[in-house]
């Protein structure tokens, strides 16, 4: 009987753009398994990884999306389309299942409004702060609130409209207006592709290599998204493998507890966990620093040499980093 070859799994650093966009290589696989694994993983990471997204928007004074806003260049439909694209990195230990959180902009500035101007819950962090929202010519002309929940996959406007009606009594608000439902794209994975390549076509026994590339929205590392996708598949396959429990209902075959531990670990390892100002966070990301373990090694001089980090920002980072170390002393 032929022995199975040892399978080698690695990240392709040549094709890595950053921690959020990279590719992986698995080899050697038996002929046909490349497409089998690649297709299953791709579908799973695109549709089954939990995250959070906007499901409803309230704009002060607006009853429906065709209302005209004074002193704002964009119409309501355009603003809604921009707001539903705001992406959040969230802490699952704070953001419990089916809970609803609010992020808001209460008109405190005029000019061009970006996602970074939105104030959010402490368990949320906006990962695309440079997303353009609207151009306002007068302070106070535009005020809005975003209602955010967690979920998986894509939820359309009509489904969210029903959900808004169900939870309207739970929505706390500081402004007047109607809650307008929007589409929700919960998936933190923007793109996932695979290719199965024969690696020994001249041999009597042909084997394959699976190349799998993945790009996320910045709320989760690419390798963690792939890991979660694999765990979700394993949880389903374990159910099928348990032939002793045929015809029995398994209430926990998704292995929710195990799968949820991964985002929590991801939150604690990311610089997002330091709760830095948007300016400091963006400067570190542009310099390709994404993990706390990366910046722990830097001296004050190293921080001061990072572009767009002023003295106050350096002081903020070093203080927040020290606080983080003190709070996590003794943890591995």
Swiss-Prot record:
Record's catalysed reaction(s): RNA(n) + a ribonucleoside 5'-triphosphate = RNA(n+1) + diphosphate
Region called Alpha N-terminal domain (alpha-NTD), residue ranges: 1-244
Leader peptide range in chain numbering: none
Keywords, sorted A to Z: DNA-directed RNA polymerase, Nucleotidyltransferase, Transcription, Transferase
InterPro entries: DNA-dir_RNA_pol_insert, DNA-dir_RNA_pol_RpoA/D/Rpb3, DNA-dir_RpoA, RBP11-like, RNAP_asu_C, RNApol_insert_sf
E.C. code: 2.7.7.6
One Gene Ontology term from the biological process aspect of the record: DNA-templated transcription
Keyword Heme (UniProt): no
Membership in a protein family: Belongs to the RNA polymerase alpha chain family.
Subunit structure: Homodimer. The RNAP catalytic core consists of 2 alpha, 1 beta, 1 beta' and 1 omega subunit. When a sigma factor is associated with the core the holoenzyme is formed, which can initiate transcription.
Function: DNA-dependent RNA polymerase catalyzes the transcription of DNA into RNA using the four ribonucleoside triphosphates as substrates.
Domain commentary: The N-terminal domain is essential for RNAP assembly and basal transcription, whereas the C-terminal domain is involved in interaction with transcriptional regulators and with upstream promoter elements.
Protein name, as recorded: DNA-directed RNA polymerase subunit alpha
Organism field: Mesomycoplasma hyopneumoniae (strain 7448) (Mycoplasma hyopneumoniae)
């Amino acid at each position: 009987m032929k022995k199975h070859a040892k399978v080698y799994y690695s990240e392709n650093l040549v094709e890595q753009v950053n921690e959020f966009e990279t590719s992986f290589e698995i080899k050697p696989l038996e002929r046909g398994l490349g497409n089998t694994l690649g297709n299953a993983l791709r579908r799973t990471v695109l549709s089954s990884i939990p995250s959070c997204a906007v499901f409803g928007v309230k704009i002060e004074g607006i009853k429906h999306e065709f209302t005209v806003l004074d002193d704002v260049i964009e119409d309501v439909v355009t603003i809604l389309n921009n707001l539903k694209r705001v992406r959040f990195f969230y802490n699952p230990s704070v953001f419990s299942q089916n809970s609803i959180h609010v992020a808001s902009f209460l008109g405190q500035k005029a000019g061009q409004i970006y996602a970074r101007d939105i104030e959010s819950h402490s368990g949320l962090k906006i990962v695309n702060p440079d997303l353009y929202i609207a151009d306002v010519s007068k302070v106070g002309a535009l005020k809005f609130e975003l209602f955010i929940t967690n979920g998986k996959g894509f939820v359309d406007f009509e489904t969210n409209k029903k959900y808004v009606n169900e939870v309207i009594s739970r929505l706390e608000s500081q402004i007047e207006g109607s809650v307008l439902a929007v589409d929700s794209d919960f998936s933190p994975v923007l793109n996932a592709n695979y290719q199965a390549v024969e690696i020994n076509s001249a041999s009597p026994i042909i084997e394959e290599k699976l190349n799998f590339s993945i790009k996320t929205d910045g709320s989760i590392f690419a390798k963690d998204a792939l890991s979660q996708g694999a765990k979700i598949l394993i949880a389903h396959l374990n159910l099928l493998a348990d032939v002793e429990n045929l015809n029995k209902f398994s209430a926990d075959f998704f292995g929710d507890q195990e799968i949820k531990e991964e985002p929590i670990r991801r939150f604690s390892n990311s610089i997002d966990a330091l709760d830095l100002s948007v300016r400091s966070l963006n400067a570190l990301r542009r310099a390709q620093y994404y993990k706390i373990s990366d910046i722990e090694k830097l001296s004050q001089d190293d921080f001061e040499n990072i572009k767009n980090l002023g003295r106050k920002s350096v002081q903020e980072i070093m203080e927040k980093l020290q606080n983080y170390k003190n709070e996590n002393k003794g943890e591995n």
